From Swiss-Prot:
Binding site for thiamine diphosphate: Y118, R119, G165, V167, D196, G197, A198, N225, H292
Quaternary structure, from the entry: Heterotetramer of two PDHA1 and two PDHB subunits. The heterotetramer interacts with DLAT, and is part of the multimeric pyruvate dehydrogenase complex that contains multiple copies of pyruvate dehydrogenase (E1), dihydrolipoamide acetyltransferase (DLAT, E2) and lipoamide dehydrogenase (DLD, E3). These subunits are bound to an inner core composed of about 48 DLAT and 12 PDHX molecules.
Record-listed Phosphoserine modification sites: S232, S293, S295, S300
Residues that hold pyruvate according to the record: H92, Y118, R119, A157, G165, V167, D196, G197, A198, N225, Y227
UniProt name for this protein: Pyruvate dehydrogenase E1 component subunit alpha, somatic form, mitochondrial
Biological process annotations from GO: glucose metabolic process; pyruvate decarboxylation to acetyl-CoA; tricarboxylic acid cycle
Lineage, top ranks: Eukaryota, Metazoa, Chordata, Craniata, Vertebrata
Amino acid sequence: MRKMLAAVSRVLSGASQKPASRVLVASRNFANDATFEIKKCDLHRLEEGPPVTTVLTREDGLKYYRMMQTVRRMELKADQLYKQKIIRGFCHLCDGQEACCVGLEAGINPTDHLITAYRAHGFTFTRGLSVREILAELTGRKGGCAKGKGGSMHMYAKNFYGGNGIVGAQVPLGAGIALACKYNGKDEVCLTLYGDGAANQGQIFGAYNMAALWKLPCIFICENNRYGMGTSVERAAASTDYYKRGDFIPGLRVDGMDILCVREATRFAAAYCRSGKGPILMELQTYRYHGHSMSDPGVSYRTREEIQEVRSKSDPIMLLKDRMVNSNLASVEELKEIDVEVRKEIEDAAQFATADPEPPLEELGYHIYSSDPPFEVRGANQWIKFKSVS
């Protein structure tokens, strides 16, 4: 009897040392998965599109929630560091658009490729880099993903080609990456992203044409967040049906605020490209909470009420949270624990990003050539290694 009481005492003692929420989560039986109805995609030159129901596992749901919260908190921390003048220069935040970067990544393979414009922090994270590397890049430190030389608009990772500062210029590059996939006989696709503000660029239509001619495995993706800088899509485009703008290229319009819609549409598009049918176009209808950049307050061309309405009715993180809680895939307490862990991760990364040293001046000329540069050509001078004065 004494042994039994001692065993019970040890169990209770161990439980008392853990947070109450963790004890409750550990003792609760959650569903392994749940089926959800999702919004039907609008189609162009397609007889059928992505499914209108999808299964979400508890494991995937928790992973997506953590990733979206991480992107959200990372962007809010970047906002804070910018206002403290620790981050300088251009800075474009993607809070509100988390379902796009996380949902797209959930629909492809790590060996697939992705290229985007300058609102790239979220994609840099979902492609596999850490918050520490991203924030350190924003602050221009040696530990940044581009050694502190790229900043907000020029981040890179394996199979992630930026972060490009010229509006629309990444789209022909994405078609070129898809050409390389086909030329090398690899079962890979390239996600080529651009915004509604870039959608009227002539180079994009040229990329459409070549991709269709050569049947390239390229998924053209227009992130339609309703505004190109401060200009609404209705004032900028004669046709706002961006998923139809490829004309001869099939397209689909997707609810970009719903991660499950984005995931299923991406899986559909990737399968289409892998089958050898050529390119496809996706329009993700999304919304950014911040202004175009940090110099844009974001309320001169739209109202605060409009922003708040989207936050209250269509927030991608809240939508996933409600689904998971209501279907017994997770508890409110468990998701709150994730929130706490994410906040700590962001704070730790921010401390590193402010304490890490800046790259010395002599590294200014590094990482330009893949091998020893041909300085003897045309009498070019050797790079002079200046000593850093910082």
